[in-house]
Amino acid sequence: AKGEVSPLAMETSGHGALKDNYFLDDGAFLAVKLVIALAQAAHQGKKLDSLIEKLPPLVEEGEYRFKINDDDFKSYGTKVLEEFKKRATDAGYQMPQSYEGIRLSFKGEDVQGWILLRMSLHDPVMPMNIEGARKGDLAKLKEIAKKLTDGFEKLDRSSLE
């Protein structure tokens, strides 16, 4: 988001980039950085996982890939994103700034977590990532996602079922 320092850019696919390397998607650079971190941790009597021990645990998550059955998949996907955003806005869902697609954030008593719907850069696919903060939240978030993506005839949402 605007105004936040982010030295790491990470994709759900596992691709990552570091500010130290001009945010280039460079797996070899990341691997070397991890080996260095491992050596430093070992020197301090720690393991590599000590670097992430303060992160909150991942409780429930899922990735769903919706195939777009349209020759002009980019235009169709753009329409889906626009309508998804409109439906989410109409429902009053929180939408933090996102440069990757449409991200919804849920912090209520009933459900906690997030949903991200985006376009694939190269394929006729719309990946949706969902993360629930507590046990049972994933199922609730999937139901919300189903409602928000209902009615798109050329969007195969069968992976969400």
Residue positions per predicted region:
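Phosphate-binding and adjacent anionic-ligand microenvironments
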Residues: 1-161
